[in-house]
Amino acid sequence: MGLTSNKVLALAVLAAVALFVATIRLWPRLSHRGRRAVLGRVGLLLATQSAIFAAVGLAANKSFLFYGSWADLLGREQEMGVVVDHSASSRTVKVVGKQRPDVPGGARPETGGQIHKVVIVGERSGIDSPAYVYLPPEYFQPAHASRAFPVTVVLTGYPGTAENLITGLEYPRTAFMQAREGRMRPMILVMLRPTVAPPRDTECADVPDGPQTETFFAQDLPAAVAQTYRVGTGPRNWGIMGNSTGGYCALKIALHHPGRFAAGAGLSAYYKAAEDPTTGDLFHGNQAERRRANLLWSLDHRPQGASSFLVTTSEQGEGNLAGTREFIRKVKAPARVSSITLESGGHNFNTWRREIPPALVWMSGRLGTG
């Protein structure tokens, strides 16, 4: 049974409940003086509390995927990666592995699609970043052999792991199910974290004498994917979305590069670049770039292109409600803005899982095929 399986979590909860009941029933017998009684009380308390902490820890890990397996938890996951050469590779996208999506018919690409584990080589930025590429089943079907597919870049928060987009937030499975049910058109997902120069949080900026992260996302990544896969190359074929830091980056890239991305979606996004010990000095005193990294300032002082934006927040539980409302007020034609406002939510996977299905449907409606 895997670390994140429902069976393990259920067993932990049952053990905690059983020990709690046992403590209540046995406590009168152990209320006497004497070493045995004292040791019995201490043992029951330790066992019950350990079981409760284990259940809570397993539930938190299942939600946030801090560790993916028992070996990962115990520090035994040390096997080196193996580079695999595949025909899908190009000069700027190296395919190093393939895997089945967790969907019905996932064993066959033409019925379940396929996920490629890749390394994207940034020729202009000099950044190489790992990523996952989800190809929908239609990509492998003869009837669509000449079709160019729309692409959505999907970003995690900081520091994030790209694997969480697959196993935790279930982007490929959600896209597959929404397309199968006719709610959205099939699209390719390029999934990665915004931390392309770890451990630094660059806030998707081109840092002077540092990582050129904005260039990587706005120029290198679209060019690399277009060289490797059957995708459209116009702005109407490309969208970008993410949660938290990834949401800020998605809105920023779509706002500043409408000639590349027709749509940007920020789930629980913030609207001004963070500046803290994880980011370091992003602007080196360049106030123009600091202002440009403030999306609310940019909406007021820079031309707005024809991109569409989706922003999400909650009436209770999230700290970006006021900023989101201000962002909505400031978007002007030809740009467009839509929103999702939950009654209550938080800065967590559970909230984003509620927003991802409608966000993907929204994104599909803004993008076209090549």
Describe the residue ranges of each PLM region.
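Non-catalytic cap/lid and distal C-terminal segments of serine-dependent acyl enzymes
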Residues: M1-G370
